[in-house]
Structures are given as C-alpha cells and as structure tokens.
Amino acid sequence: MHITQLVLRHFRCFDVVDFFPLPGLNFFIGENGSGKTSLLEAVHLMGYGRSFRGRVRDGLIRHGSENLEIFVDWQETALINARRHRAGLSHYGQEWIGRLDGQKIIHLASLCAALAVITFESSSYQLINSNAELRRRFLDWGLFHVEPDFLDLWRCYTHVLKQRNSLLKQKEELAMLEAWDQKLSEVGEQLTFRRFQYLERLKQRVIPLISRITPNLKIHGFNFNHGWRRHELPLIDALFISRERDYQYGYTSLGPHRSDWTPQFSSIPGVHVLSRGQGKLITLMCLLAQAQDFFDQRGEWPILSLDDLASELDQKHQWRVLEMLAEIPAQVLITGTEIPQGLKPFFSVGAMFHVEHGAITRMF
C-alpha cells in the first residue's frame, strides 16, 4: 500500500498542508523543528491511533487552534482486489472522531487494521534493550495485521486476566478462581503459540537481513520466554502452583502477559554490549523483517516511516540500508536534517522534499 495524499490541518507546526508523496523512497530534509518528524507522526497517528511523541495536551494541536484534522488517501497494492481508501481523524474538545471510507468508526482499531504503518523513530531502539512490554507489543502488532482473529484472542486474554486479578484482590472463593484459571490457560496457550510461531517466522527473515547489513554481529536466532516454564508444565498447572503467591501479591504473576524475547548472537554475549548504532540497526532489521512478513502474508508492503534514519549510522551502513529499501516495492518516508552522503546514490529512485516553517516543497 502507499499513501497518495496527506492533508494536515492545525497539526503541530502545520497550519494547512496538502501533500502528495510518491511510491518508493521519499526523503524529507529540514532543520530541527521544521516539521519533518511531525509529518511522520501524523502518518503514525493514522496507523496506530496514537502519537509516538505524546498526547494532545503535549502540543499535537497547533498553538492558537482548537482542533486538528488529518486526512489520508491510500492505494492498496495487492495483486487481487486492490482498493483505494480515504480516512480521517479529528480531535475536537476531548474527543477523537474517525472516519474510514465515508463511515464513522467506533473503534480506532478499524482504522489501524486498514492502514498498516511501520514506524522507526528516536525511541525505537528501545525495542531490543528496554522493557518486555515493547517486545510483546511488537509481536502483537504483526499478528494483528496478518491474522484476522488475533485481536479477539488478545482481547479475550486481557479480559480474563483482568477478572482473575480482580478475584485475587478480593480473596474470592476457590471455585471461582479455578474457573477463571481454566479459561485463562486455554486462551493463554493459544496466544503463546501464535506469538512463538510468529517469532519463528521473523527469525527466518531477520537472520539474512542482519547478515547483509552488519555481518559481524552474527545473529543466530531469538530466545523466547513464554512467561512461565512452559517446557516443564502447561499454563493451567503453573497457575495452580503460583496461586498462593498470586493471592499474596494480588495479581497474576505468570502467563503470556509476562513473556519476552531477545536476539541471540554468537559473536557477543547479548544486546547489552551493543552500541547505539548497532542497536538501531538490529531494531530496524526486526522492523523490516516484520514488513517482509506482512508482504508474504498479505501480498502488499506496509508503509515504512523512518525518522532521522542516518543518525548514528556511518556512510557504509547508510548505503547498505538504503540499497535494501530501494530493492523493495514499498513506500518509504525518510527524514533527516541534511543530505547524508549515503543517500545520494538513491536520489534517482526517490523524491526529495524540503520541510521548512510548516511547508513542504519538492526539490527533485
């Protein structure tokens, strides 16, 4: 899929912008504060239902305005039944209002399911060296987009987990807890299996990507922590064993909501010794593997949104990454404060835009 038109009204530093990105590589160059990141933030907001930089009160609405509006037109690129779509997202007062193909949407998940955006921004490197919640969210995003029933499964597990935690806090009858344990284990085993299978698919894609971009790291796979000792006992038994402890703490201490995964290398002891540049490359390759899996399952590429791509990467790695991006038929949005040397060979296969004072001008 690729965006054919993006309209911003009263969003961050933009007053009114009507912009037409091209298929393929789109480079956005401008000084800090010019609006480059805000442009990608708007695309991210449409694809995720939230900003990666903060909430409305943190400055999403342009100073002096009372509301904001974002409209996106995009074209599906799958070979079969490809369609055009138009979506809008507005914020008035305390309320978000969304529309998709002329219909008001009740849940933003409907919009997120239609427009697939993979974003790489300044905090994305935390995917591999921060808390496990980010890594679970990474897997769940991919499953949400390629398995139609995954959202229902995830919501069911979240609901049952909430009910069990409520019973633990209230010290309810044992029979009630056993019933919820049974349901939690049934749904939790399914959720865990889906995540594990998805991570196995990603492994097959990540290894060749990293070997091509930074071969000295020698990644050989991922370690998946199920959230309990699954190789020793099923979840229902683990819940039974942990029941006394869970009563004491007032929450469920194990299960898929405690799962995690980490890259495994043969050349280094772990992610903790990676430089920021290496961490950025590993994270970016994980995201590109996810995009590739999306294509394999759906027949089209998601939109790739890469903020400040060149920072902390030397010219050699810039070139390798961009060479890879130029080979795939995805729409890629890339920002930077200047034109890095590694980008210049790829101008012939992309478009260059200058962002300044909330205006976007095509350079070539």
Swiss-Prot record:
Record: residues binding ATP: G30, E31, N32, G33, S34, G35, K36, T37
Source species of the chain: Xylella fastidiosa (strain M12)
Signal peptide range: none
InterPro entries attached to this UniProt entry: DNA-binding_RecF, DNA-binding_RecF_CS, P-loop_NTPase, RecF/RecN/SMC_N, RecF_2
Source taxonomy: Bacteria, Pseudomonadati, Pseudomonadota, Gammaproteobacteria, Lysobacterales
Protein name: DNA replication and repair protein RecF
Gene Ontology biological process terms from the UniProt entry: DNA replication; DNA synthesis involved in DNA repair; double-strand break repair; SOS response
Main localization of the protein described in the UniProt heading: cytoplasm
GO cellular component, one term: cytoplasm
Cellular compartments annotated: Cytoplasm
Cited Gene3D superfamilies: P-loop containing nucleotide triphosphate hydrolases, RecF/RecN/SMC, N-terminal domain
Record keyword Secreted present: no
NCBIfam families from the UniProt entry: recf
